[in-house]
């Protein structure tokens, strides 16, 4: 069993160096090589106010990582860390998965005015339980803050895929989709707001209703997705809401 912090340095094709700290959700942090001669390496990460210094010994670089007055040993070697995720569903699957896409037209249906975030196509996966029949319930999954794929993959864990598998085996269909600018979804991720994310989810609900295949339609939202679930319920767009770690206080009390 591995305990600790995974840190990876990458030398890019243009000679620049970046650092990833996947356990902290940080990737592509620019690093400056301050010293590279014979067996000595020194790298500075100004954004983190951190520095790494090490010496080559055999197949490893033995060194020290320092940040804001704290230091600890950090040894580097070539390789790939494979994390065991036994909960990730594996084929064969006892249900059907269909690639779908739906559109947020970026226009208010009542006023005709542009909406926040603008137009986007959202690519996703619609999962049907075995022996699916019209009128079965369906759940649309809404991710938390930040742009994530349809599985809401975080550090190699795919919670939305796990939940979709669980629900499909219990007779509930699901729709999960890539956030704007991720995977097969279009749109400008720099213009994303909670409102635009809500409208994307609403477009997903409208798509599900347009198929005329499902009965009750619910929203399962994680973190910020829980807020979006409440927003959609308040508008009368969903039949039920499941909030995973969604706030229950006013925003000005949460922050």
Predicted regions and their residues:
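N-terminal cap/lid segment of alpha/beta-hydrolase-fold proteins
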Residues: 82-134
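Short beta-strand element of the alpha/beta-hydrolase
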Residues: 135-144
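The serine-hydrolase catalytic nucleophile loop
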Residues: 149-162, 179
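Conserved alpha/beta-hydrolase
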Residues: 162-184
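Alpha/beta-hydrolase active-site loop
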Residues: 190-211
